[in-house]
Regions:
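Conserved phosphate-binding/catalytic loops in two-lobed NTP-binding clefts
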Residues: 4-5, 150-169
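Conserved phosphate-binding catalytic cores of ATP/NTP-utilizing and phosphoryl-transfer enzymes
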Residues: 1-26, 31-40, 123, 170-177
């Protein structure tokens, strides 16, 4: 039996065999996975029980801002200021955002601040060593968040094709290997 974690590692290794750190930001959780030179999982850390820093978090924030979740990337790209969104809880973040709106902070800057908050949460989970791969729906639908992350760590982050399916692809590779393919 293969775990979700090992399947993400296998799928990522197929595309980026030199990567040693994987960041997966999905709908319900986010994780940092460390792999060895053969793509085997050696360690992983997962976000807290709170949804903050996940795709569900971004959907909730989009609802609170009364924008479609698909517009978040476009808004963040057009931001002109860096603002801090510091809360670690979706409920508290929503309250913090309402305060920013009342203070007439531009919506674009708020969304950029939310992206920075997601990145900060990931970086607090574990160090990112060597080449870094990002998978999950957040990477698929928020390419500007990936670029912001690259700026934060000072190096390129590799994103596989259809990153939201990397774990499923890894599972398929394991199944193929088990059949002798």
């Amino acid at each position: 039996t293969r775990t979700e974690i090992s399947c993400h590692a296998r799928g990522s290794y197929h595309f980026f065999p030199r990567a040693h750190s994987l960041v997966d930001i999905g709908g319900q959780d986010s994780k940092v996975i460390k792999v060895d030179d053969r793509g085997n999982r050696i360690a992983f850390k997962m976000n807290r029980k709170c949804a903050a820093g996940t795709g569900a978090f971004l959907e909730e924030i989009a609802n609170r801002l009364k924008v479609k979740v698909g517009r978040l990337n476009e808004l963040a790209e057009k931001a002109t200021k860096d603002i801090s969104i510091g809360s670690y809880c979706t409920v508290f973040t929503a309250t913090e955002i309402l305060t920013k709106i009342r203070e007439n902070v531009d919506l674009k800057d708020i969304v950029r601040g939310i992206y920075q908050s997601v990145i900060q949460r990931i970086m607090e989970m574990d160090t990112l060593e060597g080449e870094v791969v990002m998978t999950g729906g957040v990477a698929a639908h928020n390419p500007f968040l990936v670029r912001m992350f690259e700026e934060k760590i000072g190096r390129k982050i590799f994103v596989p094709p259809l990153p939201q399916f990397t774990g499923a692809f890894g599972a398929a590779l394991y199944a193929l290997e088990a059949k002798g393919g």
